[in-house]
């Protein structure tokens, strides 16, 4: 995206030129649980066009939440960026986020991807997708998450460890959609089908599917997109090319999100940055290089186009937070290690 286009976006969100030119000592401090160099470029361009310096601190989501709790009102954080509904909902429940009253931000973010109380707002979308090694199983035989619990997949399924927040949110999603009893039976069915020990990460799970150690797996879509695009090297690119990604119908969609810290000292600057990041141009700027989906639309990369479109299920991000704790209990009681 050219700087002139970004400047138009900043003007559209109401940043007065007199207050955005370099030389004005304005800044916004961001605590980010996202770890992408491409995010830094988006912040840099924002600073160049507004004169608002972005000071960035990166750590895991859990670490950042604990830091905010420890710092209290003395925190220097203005914005917190987190991945997954569980983390952003947790930050809100802990009273770490301040509501933002902005009609523009609400217009930017569909209701299902923002907090009903305006404490956080989605920036990008990620699908918890199913991947298949077509040499071991017919991809057309799997269309929904429910299919992962079918007995004919016994010894063929690979899953990430229970402590992973992405799978916790997937189970929470199914509790909302299908009810606790059905979700419990589904989890038990998947655990019975597991082949390998539970994996520590999506990347290693994808490699196992490519190597034929697993026939089926569950991963966030962008991990496979990056590997197929060559982002992790030629060997991974070659290994993963045959893997087929299935968008379950309907699909569990999660987000990365931003909220203004309750302790924010630079509120106007924080709102300006969040307004931009949630705008069509801002969301696309963050999502594009990481192969995530913007808030609206399905991206422009060849990898995402090859995955096809998806139909999100009817569960809102805030609903996931309400069932997360029960999801973890069900996973533990069902033998998901």
Model-derived segments and their meaning:
Residues 129-136, 253-266, 285-286:
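A bilobed periplasmic-binding-protein/Venus flytrap-type ligand-binding module shared by bacterial periplasmic
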Residues 126, 155-163, 187-191, 196-199, 237-262, 276-300:
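Periplasmic-binding protein-like
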Residues 4-19:
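Bacterial N-terminal signal peptides
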Residues 33, 37, 59, 76-213, ...:
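Extracytoplasmic ligand-binding site segments that recognize negatively charged/polar headgroups
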